[in-house]
Regions:
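Acyl-donor (CoA/ACP) binding surface of acyl/acetyltransferases
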Residues: 1-18, 27, 68-154
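Generic alpha-helical scaffold signal
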Residues: 15, 39-42, 60
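Generic structural signal for secondary-structure transition and capping sites
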Residues: 18, 29-30, 54-57
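Alpha-helical elements of Rossmann-like donor-binding domains used by nucleotide-donor carbohydrate transfer enzymes
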Residues: 20, 44-47, 51, 107, ...
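Conserved catalytic core of Hanks-type protein kinase domains
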Residues: 23-24
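Conserved GNAT-fold acetyl-CoA-binding loop/helix
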Residues: 29-51
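Short, intrinsically disordered/low-complexity patches at protein termini
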Residues: 43-46, 54-57, 97-98, 125
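A short helix-loop-beta-strand connector motif used in the catalytic cores of GNAT acetyltransferases and
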Residues: 52-65
């Protein structure tokens, strides 16, 4: 499968995704790409999955599983820090190691942008990316994101 052929779909998080969430949220290598730097318990994640309304207006966030057309999970994408007054949200994306550099990240950013624009009617998506994360910076630039601010000592 080439980068241009990487077809994915986004779906709601199911209880069966708990192990995946647990692995991602407790992977210390990923703590620098998000706002959390503490482990999450299975109980906390189970509670999140059970109680999330999947309504971005209620929760101010929405998380989706990224999977291939064949149903294989390749990652997770979310819109967080949703600001309905200013029609914007922050994008978070994790593609599992085994699926990186196959176009899944690019396809995911394309689909989440389409969802944000055409379903949620947002006019701005943004992301905080560590300046050392060259792969992610390149991915977002290639999808049309522009670097507008470098935050020092963040």
């Amino acid at each position: 499968m080439t980068d241009k052929e990487s077809k994915i779909r986004l779906r709601a998080i199911e209880p069966e995704d708990l192990d995946l969430l647990y692995r991602i949220e407790n992977d210390r290598k990923l703590w620098n790409v998000g706002t959390s730097n503490v482990p999450y318990s299975r109980y906390t994640l189970h509670d999140y999955v059970a109680n999330a309304s999947d309504d971005i207006y209620t929760d101010r966030q929405v998380r989706m599983i990224v999977e291939t057309e064949e149903g294989e999970t390749v990652g997770i994408v979310d819109l967080v820090n949703f600001d309905p007054s200013n029609n914007r949200a922050e994008v978070g994306l994790i593609i599992l190691d085994a699926f990186r550099r196959h176009g899944y990240g690019s396809s995911t950013l394309e689909q989440i942008a389409d969802y944000a624009l055409n379903v949620l009617h947002l006019h701005q998506l943004f992301s905080f990316i560590d300046t050392r994360n060259e792969a992610s910076l390149c991915l977002f630039r290639n999808r049309g994101y522009q670097e507008s601010l470098v935050i020092k000592d963040w």
